[in-house]
Structure formats: structure tokens, C-alpha cells
Amino acid sequence: MNIEKKGLLFLSYGSPSSKDDLVPYMTSIRHGRVPTDAEVANLTHRYDVIGQWSNVELQTMAERQYNRLLTLLPSIPSAIGYLHMKPSIADAVDALVKQGVEHIIAIVTAPFFTSLGTGAYEKQVQAAIGDFQDVTFDVIRAWWDQPSFIEYWVKAVSDCINDTKDVFVIFSAHSIPLINSHNADSYALALEESAKEIAQRCDLEQWSVAWQSAAPHGQWLGPTVAEAINQSLHSGAIHIAFVPFGFVSNHVEVLYDNDVECKELVDAGGAV
């Protein structure tokens, strides 16, 4: 009996290591549209503020997550591929096939599924395996409901608020365009369910779910994090804690959007 050889494909978004990476990185994100000088300058500033260019940990976060996963699965053929950087997803699929892999199991560094997010990785894997006969794949589309994910955030939130009173906790994730109401609804429901379980286990009295990092055009899933901050301030919150549990690593959307922009709003409102 023939047993097909399985391989692990670790998929991540990608992050620029130098300023020279920015234009091709942004062009890929924008589906081939080259960014303007102003757009490059804006993102450069954000990366400058968080220290991206001198922080190896920020530059190699996905690679370190991948290597950690390999310690749990040391005997399976594996490869890492990025949506917007090298090595590409096609490069990673090619590497697995060269190792004799016949069935690819892909996992994305995003705990919640969206067709625009996780689905984009899935489409690239599908396109890449089209070049090879008899190669199949499955994608682990979501893993937010795994006990270890909830346990991690319960501990993180508990450690953050400790014995602090009057804390308003804002759970956040990346917003998505409202072009597919079913996709947005299922995404929002998953976030709400996960946040509710974490909040209950942490005995949180005041909390909400909000959405961040939306593009400046079109209609996006809300409320925004800024709106949630204003709501919490209006309710008299003294302390506000952000839980960006839709992300699995520190990067610009956490270290700048939350730690810089959100902090400015909180400070201006007289809270901490």
C-alpha cells in the first residue's frame, strides 16, 4: 500500500527587513499598484518609530515562529512561504515538491478565517500546485477555537490587568471590507465568541470588540478602535487595555497603530 508523503507549509504575511524592501512590499500588497512617494514616506515613518530597521526580532518574527513549530514536528518535510515577501508561497510549494511531498498541509499565521485574508494564501497555494501533477493540499483555515489559543490570551490579559480596577478591555483584530456580508458576519461572530470566553474567564466587567487597520477608502467592518476608545472614555474608564488577539506577533499594526496612535487618544482622554 502506498502512503502519500505529507509536508508542512507555513504561511505568513511577510515583513520588510530594510527600506529597500518597502516599494516591492507595498506594491505586492496593492496587487501591483506602485505606491506614491507620500504612501512610502508614511509607512517608512511608522517603521522608523517602532525600530523596524534595527530590530532583528521584528524582521524575523515569522521565521522564529516557523522554527518553533518545527521543534514540535521535527520529522515532517516543511517550508515557509510569504504572501508579500520572498520566499514566495510558490517558492515554498516548489521546495516541498522537491522533497517528494505529495500532500501539503498549510497553516496560516492568522487565527481567524476570512476569505480576503486566509483565502488569499489558499488561492496562491492552489495556483502553485497547479504546476505539479498529483500534488494535493489542505489548509488549516482557523485555529482560534483551540484551547491553547484561549489559554494564552487568558493568561496575557490576566497578567496585564493584574489587580487593576476599572479596566476597560478592547479586543481588536484587522478590519475587512464590507463587500461580502456573510464573510464579515462569520468573522465578527468568531471574534465575539472568542473575546467573550476570554473576558468571562478573566472576570472582565467592561470590554468590547473593535476593528483596526482599515484602509481609508470604502466601507469596513466596525466599530473602529478609535470609536471603542471614545466609548470607553465616555463611560468613565480610567484604565484601558488593548488586546490585539487577531494578530499573532508584534508588528507595525500593533506597535504603531495600538502602542502609538491609540495611546495618544487614551492620553488625550485623561485615561491610562
Regions found by a protein language model. Name each.
Residues M1-V272:
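Active-site-proximal alpha-helix that buttresses catalytic centers in soluble enzyme cores
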